[in-house]
């Protein structure tokens, strides 16, 4: 992100207990296709939120969901047959995973490098990552008549920062090999990446 951008300095817990598939559904659809096309059997969802989409699309796979309280207690109670764990990015899971999903998480964390390094410590085959595109978000907000500060912090109080399309590509490519980067067709502000580890 460009010099002079104002990042939010405090983390606000993102409670998603009641969310189903109104956001990021296309991300999980694309992740499901990637999983099927490659015969993948194991899926890790970092910041799985309500876990609705994880279970909707991957109930036939071995799945692990990572999140924080209070989301964690909610999804453990709601889906007791699945494996949900608490994670603050300090220690990656020991298992290998075919697919890692990190959907609309990176904009919420104070130190995105910590998240990227956490993912890099996981042995995986493909990563699906998504986050809002700042330029599109700001265009939509202006169309609603909202006050928008081009230099941040984001209008959404739960977002620490937001990347433009080009900025995200530059940032993530320093950690992973990007295979595809595109905007989802229905949720217009969502940019999505498919990537692989540089360690493979």
Go through the PLM ranges and name each one.
Residues 1-95, 103, 113-118, 143-200:
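Conserved N-terminal segment of class I S-adenosyl-L-methionine
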Residues 103-106, 130:
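Residues lining the SAM
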């Amino acid at each position: 992100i460009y010099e002079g951008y104002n990042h939010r300095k405090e983390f606000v817990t993102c409670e998603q207990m009641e969310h189903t598939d109104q956001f990021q559904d296309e991300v999980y659809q694309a992740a499901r296709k990637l999983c099927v096309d490659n015969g993948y059997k194991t899926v890790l969802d970092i910041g799985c939120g309500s876990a609705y989409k994880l279970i909707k699309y991957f109930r036939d796979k071995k799945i692990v969901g990572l999140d924080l309280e209070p989301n964690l207690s909610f999804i453990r109670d709601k889906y007791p047959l699945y494996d949900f764990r608490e994670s603050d990015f300090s220690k990656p899971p020991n298992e290998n995973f075919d697919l890692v999903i990190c959907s609309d998480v990176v904009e919420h964390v104070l130190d995105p490098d910590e998240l990227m390094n956490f993912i890099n410590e996981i042995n995986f085959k493909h990563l699906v990552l998504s986050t809002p595109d700042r330029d599109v978000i700001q265009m939509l907000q202006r169309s609603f008549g909202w006050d928008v500060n081009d230099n941040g912090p984001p209008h959404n109080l739960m977002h620490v920062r937001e990347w433009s399309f080009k900025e995200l590509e530059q940032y993530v490519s320093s950690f992973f090999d990007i295979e595809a980067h595109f905007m989802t067709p229905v949720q217009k502000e969502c940019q999505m990446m498919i990537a692989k580890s540089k360690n493979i």
